[in-house]
């Protein structure tokens, strides 16, 4: 494992490291970053391609905490998928539920202050709790270019406002490439 100074160096030279990692595969990126991380976490919403990142990270190191902010509004299919992943891969699933509960009838429309409060209550509050509990130095995520305008401004490596190194090993991959990866296991 690299020293804290080496991780600080990577954070201070993100552009150089992003350029260096651009033509590397996810396994290489994950292995390289794990060599400098003492407290990595992995996040998932158990969406269509989430197994790719969970599989790739767990191949490199067992037992990394997998943070799942369970909003309480998941489909049975998502719950079954999460259970299947937990049973088949060497992960340490950490499920965080919102402190505040909402019923279906309380769901706000997708705009305005009520919606922002809802998002804060069911997504951000549990995630902030997870970050406080795990105090990660590295956060593996499956965000990709082309998903949102904001995500298009990021890269393989980026920094959160809290200084956590955010790593997106599949950042430049297409849906087709991810389907191909998933078909291998």
Predicted regions and their residues:
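Nucleotide-activated chemistry modules centered on ATP-dependent adenylation/adenylyltransferase
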Residues: 2-185
